[in-house]
Amino acid sequence: MSTLDLNHLADLYDRKDWNACKKELLKLKVELAKQNLFVPTSDKEKASFARNVFEYGVLVSIQTCDIESFARYASQVIPFYHDSLVPSSRMGLVTGLNLLYLLSENRIAEFHTALESVPDKSLFERDPYVEWVISLEQNVMEGAFDKVASMIRSCNFPEFSYFMKIVMSMVRNEIATCAEKVYSEIPLSNATSLLYLENTKETEKLAEERGWDIRDGVIYFPKEANALETEDGMLIDEEDELELPPTASKHTISSIRQLLSYTSELEQIV
């Protein structure tokens, strides 16, 4: 099979002409369908060609934030990652993106199934993309929110940007839900730090979405969200609620996040 059309796609990708990439991908998929190459074949040259097409499909889809298309291409390329083919230079990136996609969807069981299905387990240790996502998932599951935020802030993989924002939003919502149950009010500026938001405007937007009341620079949580059941069945009432200082230090904010993580773990146990 000629690589002429594939070279053209590679050139379009390098030029970041995403619309042209999509059109070229469509042409190539028609060719793949004609030759029954949507499933792995014993012809290594053809299988490698199909794998390349699907890999480009994954990367173009994430660049254009077309997640439905991304999921489709990811499911099509993964069966082509087997030992009989020469390893793909894009395998780590595509695998990492697929794992991050599953994490962003909170499909944790599928995340671990996908890990188990990776034919080259050494990828976990030598590939920076896969290793990074595995570490991120571990921190999310452990409630290590500071580590999650730090990893996302310092990540140098631009292809991960879309899904990282979703994961950070998941963490933020988890913190917000726990915060509602732990105390009845919190200074707006402290909430901004606690929720890893850039400024109070973002916090005000989140407050509106969650039905929080803001008065005089203080967020008041809904009463019905304040009761929290402990492991012994007792409820924390208003007298037991935590009181934040007017200006919490970074250490205080970090300690609160640890408490919220512990609170979340208690709820999972109960």
Curated annotation (Swiss-Prot):
InterPro entries, sorted: 26S_Psome_Rpn12, CSN8_PSD8_EIF3K, PCI_dom
Domain spans labelled PCI: 65-237
Keyword annotations of the record: Proteasome
A GO CC annotation given for this chain: nucleus
GO annotation terms (biological process): proteasome-mediated ubiquitin-dependent protein catabolic process
Classification via Pfam families: CSN8_PSD8_EIF3K
Keyword Phosphoprotein: no
Family designation: Belongs to the proteasome subunit S14 family.
Function: Acts as a regulatory subunit of the 26S proteasome which is involved in the ATP-dependent degradation of ubiquitinated proteins.
Name of the molecule in the record: 26S proteasome regulatory subunit rpn12
Lineage: Eukaryota, Fungi, Dikarya, Ascomycota, Taphrinomycotina
